[in-house]
Swiss-Prot record:
UniProt gene name: ttll-9
Tissue expression pattern: Expressed in head sensory neurons.
Pfam families: TTL (PF03133)
GO biological process, one term: reproductive behavior
Chain residues that bind ATP: Q188, C189, Y190, V191, K201, D203
Keyword flag Ligase: yes
Stated name of the protein: Probable tubulin polyglutamylase ttll-9
Amino acid sequence: MSSISNELSVTSSQNVISNSKEQRKKKILFKCALTNTISDVLTNREGWAQTQGDDWQFFWVTREWMTTCYDKHKFSEKQMICHFRNDFELTRKDFLIKNYKKARKAKEKSGIDVVSEFNFLPSSYVLPTEYHLFVEEFRKYPNDTIWIMKPVAGAQGKGIFLFRKLKHVQEWKKKDSSGSEALPYVVQCYVHNPYLVGGKKFDVRIYVLVTSFRPLNAWVHREGFARFSHSRYSTDSVDDAFVHLTNVAVAKTAADYDPERGLKWSLPKLFRFFKSVHGQSKLSKTMNDLTNVIIESLKSVQNLIIQDNHCFELYGYDILFDENLKPWLLEVNASPSLTASSQEDFELKYRILNHMIDVLDIEKKLIGNENEVGGFDLLIKNSKPVELCKVDFHTQPFFGTQFNLRLGDYVEATPMP
């Protein structure tokens, strides 16, 4: 009796294991190296299951993994990861400047008026290598011109400072070059006339998904946000980070910081505000200019980024508008923060990441000729810009396109843990 019972137990266990394997075969297996919103999205996505092995189809990797494991990993046909091997060509500030200047020079040689057609980075130099070129440029500007210094790989506002006098850069240069190569920084002419709302400076975060560089295929999400500085704008003091920087990490250090107080606007809200103040025609031009900034910046690195069909990347574009609504590119982030600062922020990032997975179409639900998926609009297909729908900005949120209901309405976000 005992042996029969044991046999039944073994058979039952084998069936459970077999059924478990069958269930896993039907699911899309993922790994995730982070524990923020992307982890929540993947865990809650229907038909997906987490794995600790190498049988994953989707892996949200870290920058460290790309550095240490990418070259060694043997990808299977269906595996996808969230970074391109040398995305730094676009996302490291010194490389961004170098590639922008190279593309600008090529356009100038071909007879294009770069002042009007290719002019979206402020005057910029990489230090210490371009120090003498910077000094030459510095002396052409009025004495009260403000410049801004940024570490090439910095984030969250760390290491940034503003100055008016050359001696401040000379002091930095002396301090950072103690017998070894100085820490690279970029120096840029500060956009002194930013567009202000309620007397405050702001920049905008736009999410751009690149699924291929050759050919160039890129999508832009209609949602995003404007980040406002903590204090009202003034050029009287260049040392007050609460006035000049819009990073949430900086604002959080203020004694009276309140994440729910309204230091962020949604992009649709911002663009509706622009329209109410400046009219549809002006807003349309700004949208065209903004689209051009994204497209041209991607084209400038199209032939430099290592193309790999296993890779995609969600970039965070940081844009500043001046008082004339001209967009200036501040930087491109390879790892835009996915950690939520509020419930509203969580829901926004949850939607964007869910729509990103829809675009990647790992589940094979799409036909293949879609121009809109979730909140994403196709911006460039096979290296050619896509004509976007023209609708009323008063009712529609971003880039003049309609909501796409092909995959249903926005997925409702789960509560923040």
